[in-house]
Design a protein with these regions (language model features):
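Zinc-dependent deaminase catalytic domain
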Residues: 1-129
């Protein structure tokens, strides 16, 4: 999924899964109708959407319900995406790369969301405070 992103600095993908079915997907990139250029001089443009936000807003425009679903995402969610995840009813988040800040993880855990770090190069572990 991440390879669909036009962003050069970092490509992130997200899948929302419920009852073993993919109900939404997203990747980081510019809003619909904008040019597919995410950076200016290697700095990410402020209006670039994160993969999680794209997957969740895509769900909002569909007939699917994310209550109780699992989000699989390339990198651990930032705090802004964590807020969207909490509000969307997603109950589990699995990620493969650590983001430089962990405030999003802490917020999701505080909300009772199960957060798992799953990296094929490292031993799998559930993150808990």
């Amino acid at each position: 999924m991440a390879e669909n992103s036009y962003c050069k600095r970092r490509q992130v993908g997200a899948l929302v899964v419920k009852d073993k079915m993919i109900i939404s997907d997203g990747y980081n990139g510019t809003p619909s109708g904008f040019e597919n250029v995410c950076e200016d001089n290697n700095v990410t443009k402020p209006y670039v959407l994160h993969a999680e936000a794209n997957a969740i807003t895509k769900l909002a425009r569909s007939s699917n319900n994310s209550e109780g679903s699992t989000l699989y995402v390339t990198a651990s969610p930032c705090i802004e995406c964590a807020k969207l995840i909490i509000q969307s009813g997603i109950k589990r988040v699995v990620y493969a790369e650590k983001y430089r800040l962990d405030d999003g993880i802490k917020l999701m855990q505080r909300a009772g969301i199960k957060v798992e770090y799953l990296n094929p190069d490292e031993k799998s572990a559930s993150e808990e405070d």
